[in-house]
Curated annotation (Swiss-Prot):
The gene is aat. This is Leucyl/phenylalanyl-tRNA--protein transferase. The lineage of its organism: Bacteria, Pseudomonadati, Pseudomonadota, Betaproteobacteria, Rhodocyclales. The keyword Cytoplasm applies. Its EC number is 2.3.2.6. GO terms for cellular component: cytoplasm. It is found in: Cytoplasm. HAMAP family: Leu_Phe_trans.
Amino acid sequence: MIPWLTDRPAFPPVERALTEPNGLLAAGGRLTPEWLLAAYRRGIFPWYSDGEPILWWSPDPRLVLQPAQIRITRSLRKVLRGRRFEVRFDTAFARVIEECAAPREPGGGTWITPEIRAAYLRMHELGYAHSVESWLDGRLVGGLYGMALGRAFFGESMFSRVSDASKVALAHLARFLEQRDFGVIDCQMTTPHLLSMGAHEIARREFCAGLERWTVEGPPPAKWSGTTAAEFDWN
């Protein structure tokens, strides 16, 4: 049994999360900035489907990627050097989250509900949520979005309509964060794709201990739209 949250973000300790399903901690509550910031600082994130209440998660172990340790294969480095894609930051956040929300298969569902989209658009307006976009011939063909809090980045979702488009976005994000001394990219759930890019699992207690440092340090929230791909050297 998990607790039902009501009018304030009083999350239970993450150690009380279920082991099956892994990380389910609480239900209910809201998706206001106050709730989201309180959750992320504690290593908690919302994830649920249409028709369900808001569900809050903190899985153990946690998949993370240190920005400096991203694994760039020879073929990906060739793509990056060739600058086939134009990479932009925070110029099409609403479109990125819309593309991420599109079902992966015909008739499939999505956890990026209209309520989730509205909540993260608000966080983007406040300078906390960001997008990294891969453009090809003027078309948005890949990208990702997530939350930055202090020196921690919490990845939410990515999409790709052209081969390597999301990998290029992730590579630029990692380099951008490394240059700004970010401590971690939280990948939340383990996937083969992220493992292949250099992500690894750590214990939840280690992750949450790091958040106590990372989320109170670093720059204040602000848009990243002034960043250009010309800042990055892939040689």
